Amino acid sequence: MDPSAALHRRPAGGGLGAVSPALSGGQARRRKQPPRPADFKLQVIIIGSRGVGKTSLMERFTDDTFCEACKSTVGVDFKIKTVELRGKKIRLQIWDTAGQERFNSITSAYYRSAKGIILVYDITKKETFDDLPKWMKMIDKYASEDAELLLVGNKLDCETDREISRQQGEKFAQQITGMRFCEASAKDNFNVDEIFLKLVDDILKKMPLDVLRSELSNSILSLQPEPEIPPELPPPRPHVRCC
């Protein structure tokens, strides 16, 4: 039943009855339309060594903020943002994981439910690039083989201190089946939106055609806040990716 119809319905006795507070002043107050629910809920995980800028990338995308001296993530943190892409409204839950090995037993539980994985290294620190094979082993062991992969060389704003060339990043990504590559700067807000939106777009491309609208719409960011509900902790299930 339409709630507004109940406001105008007369009592059974035929009298007007008490005036509803909503009708005081002579006119009913128009109710706000509830926001359209999300068509999809997608989970994305950001991984990489300590200090590569995982938290900065997440916060730049979700809140458009940048912290010069962010504290290292302990275990797992997350943010939620709603985006519209390909005519669909997607509630994107982004998990920011700790880069220290002592947290691996905690963060590994988040891999299996992730539809997309962003692997980040610092272009100014060779050791973070050298750690990439270790992170790929984590992906092979815990992530779904259908998860979309994106390699990101972060801190492009520190170009003069670069230790890893763009060609090195591209070469690594080319060795992994289905992995995309790009460089970005959370500080300068360069390529940050593109990272997440391209990843979501690749995920949507894998979904059955009957759940997608035939017409494609431009990417529109929705900044409406979402309730922050702690993510679920699925049990890890070993799975090896075929490369």
Swiss-Prot record:
UniProt short sequence motif Switch 1, positions renumbered to this chain: 64-78
GO CC annotation: autophagosome; endosome; Golgi membrane; lysosomal membrane; lysosome; phagocytic vesicle; plasma membrane; recycling endosome membrane
Annotated lipid attachment (S-geranylgeranyl cysteine): 242-243
Residues annotated for Mg(2+) binding in this entry: 55, 73, 96
Record keywords: Acetylation, Autophagy, Cytoplasmic vesicle, Endosome, Golgi apparatus, GTP-binding, Hydrolase, Lipoprotein, Lysosome, Magnesium, Membrane, Metal-binding, Nucleotide-binding, Phosphoprotein, Prenylation, Protein transport, Transport
UniProt modified residues of type N-acetylmethionine: 1
MF annotations from Gene Ontology: GDP binding; GTP binding; GTPase activity
Primary localization class, coarse: membrane
Reaction equations catalysed: GTP + H2O = GDP + phosphate + H(+)
Motif extent (Switch 2): 96-113
Compartments, record wording: Recycling endosome membrane; Lysosome membrane; Golgi apparatus membrane; Cytoplasmic vesicle, Autophagosome
Residues that span the membrane, as ranges: none
GO BP term, pick one: protein catabolic process
Record's bilayer topology term: Lipid-anchor
Binding-site positions, GTP: 51-55, 72-73, 99, 154-155, 157, 185-187
PROSITE patterns in UniProt: RAB
Entry EC no(s): 3.6.5.2
Co-factor requirement: Mg(2+)
Tissues expressing the protein: Highest levels in skeletal and cardiac muscle. Also found in comparable amounts in brain, spinal cord and lung. Also detected in testis where it is expressed by Sertoli cells of the seminiferous tubules (at protein level).
Role: The small GTPases Rab are key regulators of intracellular membrane trafficking, from the formation of transport vesicles to their fusion with membranes. Rabs cycle between an inactive GDP-bound form and an active GTP-bound form that is able to recruit to membranes different sets of downstream effectors directly responsible for vesicle formation, movement, tethering and fusion. RAB12 may play a role in protein transport from recycling endosomes to lysosomes regulating, for instance, the degradation of the transferrin receptor. Involved in autophagy.
Assembly: Interacts with RABIF and OPTN. Interacts with LRRK2; interaction facilitates phosphorylation of Ser-105. Interacts with GDI1, GDI2 and CHM; these interactions are disrupted by phosphorylation on Ser-105. Interacts with RILPL1 and RILPL2; these interactions are dependent on phosphorylation of Ser-105.
Domain characteristics, as noted in the entry: Switch 1, switch 2 and the interswitch regions are characteristic of Rab GTPases and mediate the interactions with Rab downstream effectors. The switch regions undergo conformational changes upon nucleotide binding which drives interaction with specific sets of effector proteins, with most effectors only binding to GTP-bound Rab.
Alphabetized PANTHER family for the sequence: LD44762P
Family classification: Belongs to the small GTPase superfamily. Rab family.
Name under which the protein is recorded: Ras-related protein Rab-12
